[in-house]
Swiss-Prot record:
Binds 1 FMN. Binds 1 [4Fe-4S] cluster. Belongs to the complex I 51 kDa subunit family. [4Fe-4S] cluster binds at residues 361, 364, 367, 408. This is NADH-quinone oxidoreductase subunit F. FMN binds at residues 182-229. It is an enzyme of class 7 (translocase). Keywords: 4Fe-4S, Flavoprotein, FMN, Iron, Iron-sulfur, Metal-binding, NAD, Quinone, Translocase, Ubiquinone. InterPro entries: NADH-UbQ_OxRdtase_51kDa_CS, NADH-UbQ_OxRdtase_suF, Nuo51_FMN-bd, Nuo51_FMN-bd_sf, Nuop51_4Fe4S-bd, Nuop51_4Fe4S-bd_sf. One of its GO terms (molecular function) is metal ion binding.
Amino acid sequence: MTLTSIGPANRMARSAETHPLTWRLREDAQPVWLEEYQSKDGYAAARKALTQMAQDDIVQTVKDSGLKGRGGAGFPTGVKWGLMPKDESLNIRYLLCNADEMEPNTWKDRMLMEQLPHLLVEGMLISARALKAYRGYIFLRGEYVDAARNLNRAIDEAKAAGLLGKNILGSGFDFELFVHTGAGRYICGEETALINSLEGRRANPRSKPPFPAAVGVWGKPTCVNNVETLCNVPAIVGNGVDWYKTLARPGSEDMGTKLMGFSGKVKNPGLWELPFGVSARELFEDYAGGMRDGFQLKAWQPGGAGTGFLLPEHLDAQMFAGGIAKVGTRMGTGLAMAVDDSINMVSLLRNMEEFFARESCGWCTPCRDGLPWSVKLLRALERGEGQPGDLETLEQLVNFLGPGKTFCAHAPGAVEPLGSALKYFRAEFEAGISRQPSAAPRPATVGA
C-alpha cells in the first residue's frame, strides 16, 4: 500500500504552490527531520505567526481561508477557534490534536505523522499561538508506534532549536507539546470522549453544551483539531488566503487540497494530495488505476467505513462535502474503498457492524443495544437463516440509530453503510431469508 503521494498514478509534480501538505516528502518515504525541514521553509510560517502577526489575526486568516476540519465532520476551523473565550483571565488553555485514527480504510494521518512530523509540530505551534494555548497534546492511536517515535523525536528537535518551550523565538510565547498514546478505542475519535480518555476517565462522549471551548480537558478551555487540519495551517499563514482559495477545482465549496485515497482490489491503491472538487472517477481511474484484471467495481465508499455505499454510476461526483452529499452520503475522511463483484454485501456489512458494535462505548441505549441487534440479524441472513421481517427490522434500526437520535455520531455512522446497502443491494439480503419459518416468536418492531 502506497503511503505517500508518490507513485505512477500521480502525474502532477509536487510543489509548494500546488501540494502544500506533501511537497516536502522524501522519495524514499523516510521522515523529514528538522534540518531538512527548515531547508524547505519549515517553521517560516511559525516565525511569521509568532513575530509578525497578532493572535486574533491568525484566527481571522484561518477563518477567511475556508479551512474545514479534515477528520470527517468538516466544521470550519476558524469558526471553531473563534469559540475559544476572549477572557484573558482564562490563561490556562489546551490544544489537542486528534490523532486517534481508527476509521477502517483510513491512514492519511499516519503518513503525515510518520514522514512529516515537523509539519504537525509547526501547525500546532501556530494554532496554539492563535488560541493562546500554553500546552498541547497529540492524542495518538496506540498502534502507531512509528508515528509516536517520530513525533517524540521531532518535539525534542524543536525544543533544542528553541521552537518549543519558553519564550519561543523571543516572542514571549510559551508552548509545551506532548504525545499521549491511546488505549485503542474507536470512540476516542469523538472529541469529548478523547478528552475523557486523556484525563484518565472512561472514554464516553460528554453532553454538549458545554462545548470543549468552554469546558474541556481538566475543565479548561480546549480546542480539538485533526492532524490533517493542523498540517494545513502553516501553508495558509505562510502563503495567504488568496493563494489557498485557488487550490480547489471549480465548483468545489471546500477550499484547499485534501489527502484522498483508494483501497480494495484496485491496481494502484494509495494516498494522494489532490484539490477539492476532483471527480471520484479521476481518483479511481487515473490515480488508483481502476480495478485489477478479473474484478469489476460493484460499489464504493467515499471516505471510511462510516460512510454510505455508492454505485459505479456515482463516480462522476466531485470529491468535496457538498458534491458527495448530492449523491446521498458524506465525504468522510476522503479515503475511498472499492468493493469488487466477488464480495457478498451481507457478509461485508456483518463484518462492519461487528466492528461498530464492539467499539460502542455503551453509553446510550440505542447504540448499545441496537448495533448488536443488527449484527445478530446480519449473521442470520449470512447463514441463510433470516426470517421474514428481518430486513424491515434492519431498516427500522437504521432509522432509530440515525442522526440526532443517539448521544454522539457513532451509531449514525455505523448504520449509514447498512442503510445504503439495503437500498442498493436488497436482493442479496433477501437471499438470506430462510424458506422455513422459525418457531420462535419475533418482535414486530425495533421499539417493541
